[in-house]
Amino acid sequence: MIPAKDMAKVMIVMLAICFLTKSDGKSVKKRSVSEIQLMHNLGKHLNSMERVEWLRKKLQDVHNFIALGAPLAPRDAGSQRPRKKEDNILVESHEKSLGEADKADVDVLTKAKSQ
């Protein structure tokens, strides 16, 4: 058996080690900043990939809907407020000539219809 004097020395050394390490009941292993940043970047990447996949599926549904030639459902006229011509003006009339804007609008519409 160990003498009491030696046991007291061992206990003092053990208490000193416990108080000087300052673990406070927390795990001693901590993650480095780069590891935390890597995990954060991975989370953002996975989130963005989920969003891209969701958007791809939605666009595929729209493409399939249009490709099948399904008629578009008419909008309920009661739910939309009537538009006034003044609400549609996006650019001041003196900034563009009427002919240039109309040609561009017609070109865009014909390209959209041909697709």
Curated annotation (Swiss-Prot):
Location in or out of the cell: Secreted
BP GO terms, sorted: cell-cell signaling; intracellular calcium ion homeostasis; positive regulation of D-glucose import; positive regulation of glycogen biosynthetic process
Keywords assigned by UniProt, alphabetized: Cleavage on pair of basic residues, Hormone, Secreted, Signal
Residue span of region Disordered: 72-96
Transmembrane segments: none
Top-level taxon of the source organism: Eukaryota
Propeptide: 26-31
Protein name: Parathyroid hormone
